[in-house]
Every structure is written in C-alpha cells, then in structure tokens.
Amino acid sequence: MEKILSYPLSILYTLVFFIWLLIFHPIQWVCFNLFGYNAHRLSVAYLNLCLVRTAHLLGTTYHIKGMENVPENKPLIIVANHQSLHDITTIIWFLRKVHPKFISKIELGKGIPSVSYNLRHGGSALIDRKDPKQALPEIKKVAELVNNNNYSVVIFPEGTRSKT
C-alpha cells in the first residue's frame, strides 16, 4: 500500500515544490532589488519554510536536536553529508539565524527558479569544479562575507549527494 501511495505523493510533492520555487523567484527579486539583503533573506526563509512544510506531504517530519548549542554572532563552518534536497531546505530554515551561505557547484547558479537567484545574490560561492583557479576567489569572497558579518558557510565536501 505504501508503495502504491508513494508514486502519486512523489509527483504531488515535486509539483508543489517546483510551484513554490516559481512563486518565490519574483518575490526574491523584488525583495533584493527594492528592499535589500534583509528583505531577501526573509523571503528565502519563508520560501524554505514552505518547502519544509511541503515535505509533510510525504510524511516527512524533522526532529532537530542541539539547536541551543549553535552559537550565534560567530562565523561558522557547517560541514554536512549531502543526502537529498531536504538537506538544503532544512539547513536554511532551521539555521536561518546564522545566515547560511553555500559553497555550491556553478551549474546550480543558472536555470533553477529561486535556487539560482539565491545562490547568485545571497552571498554563496559558485564553484567551477573543473577550474581550481576560479574557485579560490569565490571561496575567499564567501569567507570574507562570513567572517565580517558572523554568518555561516555550508559545504558538502563530497560535492554531490552521498549514497551513504
């Protein structure tokens, strides 16, 4: 029975997920261009709240432990194992107080509504994994942003989703 339900629920989830991305893309643009970084950050937080809630369609729930141990107003490096799309939305939503910025592959900077815009304008580093010379200035730029503003940077060191 679960398997029978999983296919239509997966389609519904993917559809709703993509609709949220489409809805929030112009919202992010307006927030960033008319009201600045803080408004953009708030729009990204609400987008990710919607995406986290969308996961409930699949029966997914989140239990985050130890949030009281995450220091605020200090630069942080968050290193995680990349399991699924859920990683990113939960990190952005549940760690929004530490302003997570991502070190991401350059391909994600184009063509994905909301995601690409946020990566390009939200302070993340877009890395061309085939060009180390391009990566260094990007990493330096995000490191300075994180250090100067007490934000956090998130990196998935495996560089892609892990099977383990």
Located regions from the model:
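Soluble catalytic domains of membrane acyltransferases
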Residues: 57, 61-164
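A transmembrane-helix-recognition feature enriched in membrane-embedded lipid enzymes
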Residues: 1-63, 117-118
